[in-house]
Amino acid sequence: MPVITLPDGSQRHYDHPVSPMDVALDIGPGLAKATIAGRVNGELVDACDLIENDATLAIITAKDEEGLEIIRHSCAHLLGHAIKQLWPHTKMAIGPVVDNGFYYDVDLDRTLTQEDVEALEKRMHELAEKNYDVIKKKVSWHDARETFVKRGETYKVAILDENIAHDDKPGLYHHEEYVDMCRGPHVPNMRFCHHFKLMKTAGAYWRGDSNNKMLQRIYGTAWADKKALNAYLQRLEEAAKRDHRKIGKQLDLYHMQEEAPGMVFWHNDGWTIFRELEVFVRSKLKEYQYQEVKGPFMMDRVLWEKTGHWDNYKDAMFTTSSENREYCIKPMNCPGHVQIFNQGLKSYRDLPLRMAEFGSCHRNEPSGALHGLMRVRGFTQDDAHIFCTEEQIRDEVNACIRMVYDMYSTFGFEKIVVKLSTRPDKRIGSDEMWDRAEADLAVALEENNIPFEYQLGEGAFYGPKIEFTLYDCLDRAWQCGTVQLDFSLPSRLSASYVGEDNERKVPVMIHRAILGSMERFIGILTEEFAGFFPTWLAPVQVVVMNITDSQSEYVNELTQKLQNAGIRVKADLRNEKIGFKIREHTLRRVPYMLVCGDKEVEAGKVAVRTRRGKDLGSLDVNDVIEKLQQEIRSRSLQQLEE
């Protein structure tokens, strides 16, 4: 009979099989009431599942991350329960958990309107408030199939036929008259599922295949309590205000259009930000001793076959042909960098060789996945590849890590989560090589005092990698930086160097990206700063304005002086009220507005005002220029007098 070991090391002995709920009841009624599921020997199970042998057990409640995921998954079933009551002929497809919520794909003979979604949410609340028990039954494959055939659930039948073995016992979850199929676990009672909201609907092909029927996908969010739900909805509201697509239009940064899906039309001000970002990255490339190169954006398909990209990536590659040869527009820069490395004999004395490129890449992303600057088809990578010996890996990774944090800190990103992905089952190279490589990455992180978590088995077949995920002011995660070891590509493309022993050796290649896609990073920055870019990045840093025509000459002189000092400046001499001009440029998020009236002309000064509405008073022109230059040069996130 089972001995149950709890997380604190204490044990409970039973003379019969017990469920996590039984153990929770044994500990106390308060814990039992809070119990959502259990983790038995590291595996999540339903609160009602029986434990027959000795096991470790952790009780899962709404305070646990897994508990929240289970609540969300059960809310997807609740959605199914409600939609079948409102529209009984609906066919249910799949309803998984996603970030912050859930969705359900449904086959419905009507297009859901906003009023329909509101009615659906209302019915979900009515059902949840009944606090009914969710009943789990493990049944044979044949019984499960018969259940869903009788109910006309063709998609569930297809899942059974195509994805579930005949000797398996699927779990059927009964929500009163509604039945759904799932691995689980799910909440034992609907009292855990009171805090949710349906968010939107979208189209989705069955199994993600455009040859299949288009279904309707209903998205929802769910949380453990009302406070968390409201906080999330508030964050969404703030995120909507910061949406880079909206701000990009307001500030005239860029646009997209149907004739070039996923391709960016940069306007002058947006391109100014792009170029300033390039200047910043180039300064870091120089500091960390990289050489900058430029490869062709299109190469023969034969090369992509050698690299393995054609076999594994061809659906995402744009192709063209000329003179009976097929070419691929590059989706990444690494093969081109190996070609540059291969020009001329390389010695161990030439290593490490650090090669960087602002590489223009194209990937044939599905049109439905495109999203402003965040998901595009044409993008520029701040890409680099380091060719080195195995002995140099640790030092090079160390330098990459320092560079990542150096660059992120410039933008004020302080919360960075780091993950180290280790060897997968299918891989090249010896265990000894992987041992050394993984240890080198781990030690490099430790030497920089960076906490990290392992992602076991998540590395590429050709080497382990470090991923850097930064969190913005709304606590949203953006995976941008990567340091990836590659023991395969140099060999595939015949890269070599002459070692100290005069023998030919294959270099190790380190793929290194920090910002990732420049376009996406500008989208992230736009939302992080809500368009209030730090002065060094702002397209227009200063606007000089007159109050009446009599100050026009002074404004022009001052504008020229600022321009000569390397400051991006515009003069606004329009015959408009000064309040109107200030408001307009404030809405344009121009960092500084310099106002010139008769008093300023007479004193050779200028009245300085920030876009946040702070009046810095009347200041000496040369002092203002000097302070602005210092702010821009230091890439400060703070404005004058902040």
UniProtKB/Swiss-Prot annotation:
Keywords: Aminoacyl-tRNA synthetase, ATP-binding, Cytoplasm, Ligase, Metal-binding, Nucleotide-binding, Protein biosynthesis, RNA-binding, tRNA-binding, Zinc
Enzyme Commission number(s) from the entry: 6.1.1.3
Taxonomy, superkingdom: Bacteria
Subunit description: Homodimer.
GO terms, biological process: threonyl-tRNA aminoacylation
HAMAP family linked to this entry: Thr_tRNA_synth (MF_00184)
A GO cellular component annotation in the UniProt record: cytosol
Protein name: Threonine--tRNA ligase
TM regions (residue ranges): none
Disulfide bond annotation, renumbered to this chain: none
Protein location: Cytoplasm
